[in-house]
UniProtKB/Swiss-Prot annotation:
It comes from Ictalurid herpesvirus 1 (strain Auburn). The gene is ORF7. This is Putative membrane protein ORF7. GO terms for cellular component: membrane. The lineage of its organism: Viruses, Duplodnaviria, Heunggongvirae, Peploviricota, Herviviricetes. The chain crosses the membrane at residues 44-60. Residues 66-118 are annotated as: Disordered. Keywords: Membrane, Transmembrane, Transmembrane helix. Its main location: membrane.
Amino acid sequence: MAAVILERAAEFVAPGEARVGYPILAEVYRALTSDHEMRAFYETCAVSFFALFMLIIWVLHASRHPEGSTTRGTDAHTQTEGSTTRGTDAHTQTEGSRDQGSMTPEADDLTRPPLGHGRQIPVLRRRMVLDRDLRIDYSL
């Protein structure tokens, strides 16, 4: 490919004429863009590259903000391993309450609307119910 480019550039430079620096680049550019088909090819490549770049940006943005997504485990209301406080705020289940629903949070979350201000976090609530029922001790 480089040999073809240099041959086409050499056609525009007169024999015995020595050009150094920028003029030789101008001759190479003129050689590459003189052919209408090559110019159309370069324009198509540029448009395709731009479209691919925009598609990648869109996919990355969509993966960071999925529709109807819920934030899990990133706020102050999650229970860490080893903690024993239960029922101390609105996001935890108290000792006397019972869990209504399936034990698979993924299937349950698909049918529920996104979290609002008055909703509990279902995954956290189920984990606490399982911990209480199985009496799992996380302390070392």
